[in-house]
Amino acid sequence: MAAQVEIYTWSTCPFCIRAKSLLNNKGVEFTEYVIDGDEDARDKMAQRANGRRSVPQVFINDQHIGGCDDIHALEAAGKLDPMLA
């Protein structure tokens, strides 16, 4: 069974685009929550992300992974694929 991946984004955020590109290039299906200007959605994201309000915020199997730099660091360390399996 493939991992459940969720990502909170803003539509024009370059870091969000970069994180989604990594997931797309790996063929990963994910649920995207575009929260442009929606403070209620951003508050919900922050609750799940240990108070972090920056985007993107990535979750794999309901575990908070972090932002763009975090997901790319996991990829560089060879740790992302096992999480996505």
Model-predicted regions and their roles:
Residues 1-31:
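Local sequence-structure signature of Cys/Sec-based thiol-disulfide redox active-site neighborhoods
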Residues 11, 33, 46, 68:
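Conserved short-loop catalytic and cofactor-binding motifs
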Residues 29, 51, 74-77:
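A short linear boundary/processing microfeature
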Residues 35-53, 82-83:
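Thioredoxin-like thiol-disulfide oxidoreductase module
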Residues 50-59, 69:
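Structural micro-motif
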Residues 60-85:
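Non-catalytic, surface beta->alpha helical segment in thiol-disulfide oxidoreductase systems
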